[in-house]
Design a protein with these regions (language model features):
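Non-catalytic, C-terminal membrane-associated alpha-helical segments of glycosyltransferases
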Residues: 231-239, 251-301
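A short, conserved alpha-helix in the catalytic core of glycosyltransferases
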Residues: 158-160, 166-217
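Short, flexible, basic/aromatic active-site loop/helix in glycosyltransferases
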Residues: 130-165
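Nucleotide-sugar-dependent glycosyltransferase catalytic core
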Residues: 123, 200, 212, 217-239, ...
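N-proximal low-complexity "stem/linker" segments adjacent to membrane-targeting elements
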Residues: 1-24
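Acidic donor-binding segment of Leloir-type glycosyltransferases
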Residues: 19-61, 71
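Short aromatic/hydrophobic "clamp" motif used to bind/position activated sugar donors
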Residues: 81
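Conserved donor NDP-sugar-binding/catalytic core segment of glycosyltransferases
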Residues: 91-125
């Protein structure tokens, strides 16, 4: 059986749409749904309490993505956990496809499918690199290295076969329950962002594979405007700060932050030479956010 865990925070309408799609699409495996609510409003909870399709876990406060999943996982009965975002919609029986792959490949600890955006275009589904000095520099410069090295498979599996990756995003992550228990779930030091990278890294350290399955199709409705918003950028930086401190230490964090700021200055300069005002605006905003964040955490000297 697969235990599907969905963390909700003021997204009840989206969550119910997600559950509708699960009910419609999943035919090949037994499953249960556990919803962990991060102290949403009473109006939101009213929409969920009487729904018999899932078990509702009402948390007293917003404990973050990872901690809410940890709490729900303690209630799970399945041999596999599938962590799903509430703004996801199954486009096929992705749950069964992921389950069957895991069941046939005991050496794999974590897997995930291909994600599509609101326009049904391929979107980031995994990462081929762990967060690091190199990945941060590449991101600051527009992910040139990843595009060259991995071609069409940097964040989306455009091949016809499973591929080994560094990490699966937390939007659709299936993990063996026994592996989850060995890892003790998500590290509680993460609030939101970074916990999926940390989980996958620790999974690989146990000797298990992390694999992207192209046949499993899931729509992820997270808006493109939000992806570029200051709020999203700052949350990612919080996760990065925690991840680097845990795995590499404070000095590494400081060096990476300084490198990011330098790389963004270079990117702005290059796009100005090319007279690409849209890119100049994008990278200038990103540079401002990095500088403010670095100052806040006393990482930029």
């Amino acid at each position: 059986m697969v235990s599907i865990i969905i963390v909700n925070y003021h997204t009840s309408h989206l969550l119910l749409h997600c559950v509708d799609a699960l009910e419609e699409q999943v035919k090949g495996v037994d499953y249960e749904i556990i919803v962990a609510d991060n102290a949403s409003s009473e109006e939101e909870l009213v929409l969920l309490r009487d729904d018999k399709r899932f078990t509702l876990l009402e948390l007293d406060e917003n404990v973050g993505f990872g901690n809410a999943n940890n709490a729900a996982a303690q209630m799970a009965k399945g041999d596999y956990l599938l962590l799903l975002n509430p703004d996801t919609v199954l486009l096929n029986d992705a749950v069964t496809l992921l389950f069957r792959y895991m069941d046939a490949h005991p050496e794999v600890g974590i897997c995930g499918g291909n994600l599509y955006d609101s326009d049904l275009q391929p979107t980031h589904s995994f990462h081929r690199l762990y967060p690091s000095f190199l990945s941060e520099m590449d991101f600051a410069l527009g992910q040139v290295y990843r595009k060259i090295r991995f071609r069409g498979n940097a964040q989306f599996n455009s091949s016809e076969h499973p591929i080994e990756v560094a990490m699966i995003t937390g939007a659709d992550l299936m993990i063996r329950t026994d592996v989850w228990n060995k890892l003790k779930g998500f590290d509680t030091c993460f609030f939101m962002y970074g916990e999926d990278a940390d989980l996958c890294k620790r999974c690989k350290q146990l000797g298990y594979g992390v694999v992207a399955i192209p046949e499993a199709h899931i729509q992820h409705l997270e808006g493109k405007s939000f992806m570029e918003s200051e709020s999203h950028c700052r949350r990612i930086l919080d996760g990065r700060f925690t991840y680097f401190n845990k795995h590499y230490g404070t000095l590494y964090n400081k060096l990476t932050d300084a490198m990011n700021i330098l790389s963004l200055h270079i990117a702005v300069f290059i796009y100005r030479l090319r007279r690409n005002e849209r890119a100049v605006t994008k990278f200038s905003n990103r540079l401002r956010i990095y500088k403010e964040y670095a100052t806040k955490h006393k990482l930029h000297r």
